């Protein structure tokens, strides 16, 4: 019976729950030093997160934290595959001690569908995923009628996933270490494309296949071709090798060069990489101490 006494002392705390039907975590951040937690409402910030049966957050409430001391509620939902395709904006509601709102989705929509928010009917960020087990995002829309997915004048972020092509011409910069471990930058030409499976095993560390990630920003339109896009090339380890942006469809490259240990040793901004490529005919290697961004290799 002695071991039960401490447990019985804490049982009364269980009746203070914000909800008798939902799992939740109630956290308090104090704005003043306290040893007992006995402070006023203005001296603390209380946040409550409710969870479903799978342990996923379904509602977040910042208790009494609006300018007029109302609760700030954020609705969270998932699709049939468990993905969070829509991230809703929070809305303010009468302070109810952080209790769970069963009509949070309806209240969110009605809160923003007013003149104050230009009668917004999509108060959420929306992400569309490709139909594959990888669940890679292919399109992202922002809140607001002008930014929603499917709008005639669409302003969404689009993503494409490809592999290296011959037209990409990605330089294969490497780091060479001398006998005294002095690093030098070496241009090995361009990365090879379309290696056979047997060749990949043998030459994986010399010319690994690169993966190409294309991001088209909210202002992109088909007539832009490459303008308003960014191309990110990564190796089989997931390391960024090249970031390519465009101005009037002219590419501007930033290279990231790693040593044999995987450490990022060089970052070559567009001007530096352009000069190095221009001088690649006579270039063997450049000591790090002699390489100056924007200057000729010496």
Where are these regions (language model features)?
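Sec-dependent signal peptide recognition
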Residues: 2-9
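Beta-strand elements of repeat-based all-beta scaffolds
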Residues: 3, 17-298
């Amino acid at each position: 019976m002695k071991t039960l006494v401490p447990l019985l002392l804490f049982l009364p705390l269980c009746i203070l729950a914000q909800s008798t039907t939902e799992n939740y975590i109630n956290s308090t951040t104090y704005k003043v030093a306290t040893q007992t937690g006995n402070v006023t409402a203005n001296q603390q910030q209380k946040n409550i997160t409710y969870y479903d049966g799978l342990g996923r957050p379904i509602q977040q409430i910042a208790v009494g934290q609006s300018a007029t001391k109302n609760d700030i509620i954020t609705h969270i939902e998932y699709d049939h595959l468990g993905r969070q395709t829509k991230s809703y904006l929070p809305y303010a509601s009468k302070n109810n001690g952080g209790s769970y709102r069963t009509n949070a989705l309806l209240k969110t929509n009605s809160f923003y569908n007013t003149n104050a928010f230009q009668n917004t009917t999509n108060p959420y960020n929306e992400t569309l995923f490709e139909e594959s087990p990888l669940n890679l995002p292919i399109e992202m829309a922002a809140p607001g009628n002008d930014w929603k997915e499917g709008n005639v004048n669409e302003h969404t972020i689009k993503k494409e996933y490809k592999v290296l092509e011959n037209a990409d011409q990605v330089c294969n910069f490497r780091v060479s270490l001398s006998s005294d471990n002095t690093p030098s930058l070496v241009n090995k030409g361009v990365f090879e494309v379309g290696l056979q499976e047997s060749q990949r095993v043998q030459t994986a560390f010399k010319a690994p296949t690169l993966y190409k990630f294309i991001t088209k920003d909210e202002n992109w339109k088909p007539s832009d071709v490459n303008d308003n896009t960014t191309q990110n090339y990564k190796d089989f380890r997931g390391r960024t090798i090249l970031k390519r942006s465009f101005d009037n469809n002219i590419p501007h490259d930033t290279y990231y060069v790693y040593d044999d240990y995987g450490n990022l040793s060089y970052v070559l901004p567009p001007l530096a990489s352009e000069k190095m490529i221009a001088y690649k005919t006579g270039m063997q290697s450049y000591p790090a101490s002699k390489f100056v961004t924007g200057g000729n290799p010496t």
